[in-house]
Amino acid sequence: MGRKKVEIKRIENKSSRQVTFSKRRNGLIEKARQLSILCESSIAVLVVSGSGKLYKSASGDNMSKIIDRYEIHHADELEALDLAEKTRNYLPLKELLEIVQSKLEESNVDNASVDTLISLEEQLETALSVTRARKTELMMGEVKSLQKTENLLREENQTLASQVGKKTFLVIEGDRGMSWENGSGNKVRETLPLLK
């Protein structure tokens, strides 16, 4: 008799959902560890629970090295896609430029008819508006990317500031505790005040 097939849908019972999450998260991390050992690969697993708690596991290299390698690889892919898109957009504009140049060369603008000049002007305006729209789109994408980076850095700064605050508090508390202890960590006995 085989295992019962479980229907994949949201578990309504909160405690059952938490237990399932915990078991499956541990299973996922174990499978990643096994894959890393069997195939000598670097694997990073990030899991965020429904409550927002982050669980992470890295095998082989540490998490930051794996993420850095991913970002470098992903940036190369994005550059290649961007170059392909620019090339695709460049060809129609190049063709339009060649048409305009040939029209200007084949007939003197002074001898061109009004209809020819109007058509030429419309083609140039169309090419210019397409170029401006693409430029605006690229600039807006860059602004969004910079805003996202700014937000990530701000969150990281807040996290680091809170960690520094906690460590400072622990150091201050530790210093207070040391005032009641001698160097060996044993408590110093208080002496009774002298009678007057």
From Swiss-Prot:
Quote the Pfam families the UniProt record gives.
Answer: K-box (PF01486), SRF-TF (PF00319)
**GO biological process assignments:** cell differentiation; flower development; negative regulation of flower development; negative regulation of vernalization response; positive regulation of transcription by RNA polymerase II; regulation of DNA-templated transcription; vernalization response
Q: Does the keyword Nucleus apply?
A: yes
The tissues where this chain's protein is expressed are given as:
Expressed in most plant tissues, roots, seedlings, leaves, stems, inflorescences, pollen, siliques and flowers.
Q: Which domain of life is it from?
A: Eukaryota
UniProt subcellular location: Nucleus
What else the UniProt entry mentions is:
Complex rearrangements within the MAF2-5 gene cluster plays a role in the variation of the flowering time, an ecologically important variable phenotype.
The function of this protein is: Probable transcription factor that prevents vernalization by short periods of cold. Acts as a floral repressor.
Domain (K-box): residue spans on this chain: 80-170
Protein name, please? Agamous-like MADS-box protein AGL31
| Observed effect of gene inactivation | Early flowering.
Gene that specifies this protein: AGL31
Check the record and name the Gene3D superfamilies matching this protein.
Transcription factor, MADS-box
Which InterPro entries does this chain map to? MADS-box/MEF2_TF, MEF2-like_N, TF_Kbox, TF_MADSbox, TF_MADSbox_sf
**Induction info:** Requires EARLY FLOWERING 7 (ELF7) and ELF8 to be expressed. Up-regulated by HUA2.
Residues annotated as domain MADS-box: 1-61
List the molecular function annotations (GO) for this entry.
DNA-binding transcription factor activity; protein dimerization activity; RNA polymerase II transcription regulatory region sequence-specific DNA binding
Q: What organism does this protein naturally occur in?
A: Arabidopsis thaliana (Mouse-ear cress)
Keyword NAD applies? no
User: GO CC annotations?
Assistant: nucleus
Q: Which UniProt keywords apply?
A: Developmental protein, Differentiation, DNA-binding, Flowering, Nucleus, Repressor, Transcription, Transcription regulation
